[in-house]
From Swiss-Prot:
<dbReference type="InterPro" id="IPR036116">
    <property type="entry name" value="FN3_sf"/>
</dbReference>
<feature type="short sequence motif" description="WSXWS motif">
    <location>
        <begin position="327"/>
        <end position="331"/>
    </location>
</feature>
<dbReference type="GO" id="GO:0005898">
    <property type="term" value="C:interleukin-13 receptor complex"/>
</dbReference>
<dbReference type="GO" id="GO:0019955">
    <property type="term" value="F:cytokine binding"/>
</dbReference>
<feature type="domain" description="Fibronectin type-III 1">
    <location>
        <begin position="34"/>
        <end position="123"/>
    </location>
</feature>
<feature type="glycosylation site" description="N-linked (GlcNAc...) asparagine">
    <location>
        <position position="157"/>
    </location>
</feature>
<feature type="domain" description="Fibronectin type-III 3">
    <location>
        <begin position="227"/>
        <end position="339"/>
    </location>
</feature>
<dbReference type="GO" id="GO:0002639">
    <property type="term" value="P:positive regulation of immunoglobulin production"/>
</dbReference>
<feature type="disulfide bond">
    <location>
        <begin position="62"/>
        <end position="102"/>
    </location>
</feature>
<dbReference type="InterPro" id="IPR003961">
    <property type="entry name" value="FN3_dom"/>
</dbReference>
<keyword id="KW-1133">Transmembrane helix</keyword>
<dbReference type="GO" id="GO:0043235">
    <property type="term" value="C:receptor complex"/>
</dbReference>
<dbReference type="Pfam" id="PF18001">
    <property type="entry name" value="Il13Ra_Ig"/>
</dbReference>
<feature type="topological domain" description="Extracellular">
    <location>
        <begin position="22"/>
        <end position="343"/>
    </location>
</feature>
<feature type="glycosylation site" description="N-linked (GlcNAc...) asparagine">
    <location>
        <position position="138"/>
    </location>
</feature>
<feature type="topological domain" description="Cytoplasmic">
    <location>
        <begin position="368"/>
        <end position="427"/>
    </location>
</feature>
<feature type="disulfide bond">
    <location>
        <begin position="282"/>
        <end position="296"/>
    </location>
</feature>
Amino acid sequence: MEWPARLCGLWALLLCAGGGGGGGGAAPTETQPPVTNLSVSVENLCTVIWTWNPPEGASSNCSLWYFSHFGDKQDKKIAPETRRSIEVPLNERICLQVGSQCSTNESEKPSILVEKCISPPEGDPESAVTELQCIWHNLSYMKCSWLPGRNTSPDTNYTLYYWHRSLEKIHQCENIFREGQYFGCSFDLTKVKDSSFEQHSVQIMVKDNAGKIKPSFNIVPLTSRVKPDPPHIKNLSFHNDDLYVQWENPQNFISRCLFYEVEVNNSQTETHNVFYVQEAKCENPEFERNVENTSCFMVPGVLPDTLNTVRIRVKTNKLCYEDDKLWSNWSQEMSIGKKRNSTLYITMLLIVPVIVAGAIIVLLLYLKRLKIIIFPPIPDPGKIFKEMFGDQNDDTLHWKKYDIYEKQTKEETDSVVLIENLKKASQ
């Protein structure tokens, strides 16, 4: 009898423990009331901030957490703070939904979600500028450019405003310029020693002075759209048919954050070889060592007795930056070696054909004379007879024109005087 009694008592204890545990855990899973006083505001140019108050009538044994996400249910977040901010270009409408719950478990059903939206500035969308983009040049200044909107006047005066966390207030860009169809503006933006500076962004807004066009916004992360200055070639040297190239990196950059392209043009082959370099360390004894911010590369198999021209360009790599597509301009070219005398080469090109043509003419004349000597002309007997009887034949042909039987139509009589009688008479 003792065993059934003990089993019943143990069973009762388990039921009590299970019931107590279930009651204690049911309270946090209760749906809480919605948040109150949800509002939205804009700071600087593109910093949107939502704030709210805790729900009224929330459970006393509930540690409130707030579940929020944007209208497309992206970038979900559960946090105890009663605010949320985001940097976003205000070119489109953006909404935030907020609800309350008692834990960080996403599977827990939050309260009714409260939504608050912010719309972009009013204006004709066709009047807003297009292709607004900015490039951070050599970590020293930023250059932005854009195209005018479709429904804008050609004489529109644009203004660019910018802000980042190192500035106390919004600044206006003064260096407005025009390049072809593009408008643009540049402003100083120097890298600071703050390690988190490059993790920030620059907020950009472009509008007109008269307020007739719709403002356009852009956010430029400082880890992207970075374009270094071209490097500077310091030294070229040959060693064992290898070309050693040493250059100075652009300021504000370290070598491990750059990717290099070395181009070598040879005057003899008239071709260029391109080498992509990730690590350019000056470890060979031919390189000048202990030089700050310099890089080196060895080009194999280069002909030292010809003229070789070298140029280099660089870009950022993904080890330090998010973007690796913007190449710098090419460096100034540097040459090493000797180029063959082009004047002598051209002179030879002109003289050789003349000499060859003269030799061909002389050879032809010589061959003709040699032919006469080897094959003399054969005498023609008929020619001899033609020369002997040629005149007689001509006279015969001449007399053939007259008829030998032609009769004299008139007879003439001449007197004959004896010469002897004339002599006697004279004596």
